[in-house]
Amino acid sequence: MAEVLVLVEHAEGALKKVSAELITAARALGEPAAVVVGVPGTAAPLVDGLKAAGAAKIYVAESDLVDKYLITPAVDVLAGLAESSAPAGVLIAATADGKEIAGRLAARIGSGLLVDVVDVREGGVGVHSIFGGAFTVEAQANGDTPVITVRAGAVEAEPAAGAGEQVSVEVPAAAENAARITAREPAVAGDRPELTEATIVVAGGRGVGSAENFSVVEALADSLGAAVGASRAAVDSGYYPGQFQVGQTGKTVSPQLYIALGISGAIQHRAGMQTSKTIVAVNKDEEAPIFEIADYGVVGDLFKVAPQLTEAIKARKG
């Protein structure tokens, strides 16, 4: 059975949830082979998790160069493996970095590219959810080694113990024109889950009315242990920072539960959250488009509904 390369997403010595999802998706094409790219010592704490997720092989590409250059080390490693192992495909998370890596890799190896798929099927077929979830389409990439980016949360991870054979591979020296990292400024981490990794997301829209009123959204999110998101309208109005924007021009999420407070549901927003497993919408406008895709809808004042829900959750937790 042909290998399927999976670029592992990791942070601070731990696997990101999407890595297990990618390994599950890879089984539709062949035998999952995880690819860990990082500085020396990166792979060791990830091995057990990758085996449990189902990785038959783990390629370990470690070098100090990885931390000094943007994107190119991962592209170089994957391109080398694509040439040496002739995989049935390459799966990468549909993050900002992942999409750039995928595009560069596809161009490098002369292969077709499928972006932001919600499922992977036999024969290199990717399933896309388009037009705010109104349509589902299938596409097939040209070439022997399709490069596919998969939306985080779209595929349900199904652990299946893998052999996890470790193989060391070299990280090639960066080209002279590679973008070099000259300085780093870590983002201030909060207590809430990362937006694209969260199981539950509570998002606010223009209907929240002000930055101060977003405390209602945050309170509900904190009661659920959820991440906080915002629509583009809320971000453009200055209600919440842009790094939390959900939608076509923001982040794409696919949590188990998505609660939309005061969000009308423009197609651009729906494009970023339509694959959420369960959608709950609260809006005073009963004609709001968000209700078209909501599993549960409440027509009412979010400033009455959300606090009641927050208190009910706190009471239930004791």
From Swiss-Prot:
| Cofactor annotation remark | Binds 1 FAD per dimer.
- Say which domain of life the source belongs to: Bacteria
SMART domains documented for this protein: ETF
Its signal peptide is: none
Recite the UniProt keywords alphabetically: Electron transport, FAD, Flavoprotein, Transport
The UniProt function text for this chain reads: The electron transfer flavoprotein serves as a specific electron acceptor for other dehydrogenases. It transfers the electrons to the main respiratory chain via ETF-ubiquinone oxidoreductase (ETF dehydrogenase).
> What is the protein's name according to its record?
Electron transfer flavoprotein subunit alpha
Q: Which organism is it from?
A: Mycobacterium tuberculosis (strain ATCC 25618 / H37Rv)
Gene that this sequence comes from: etfA
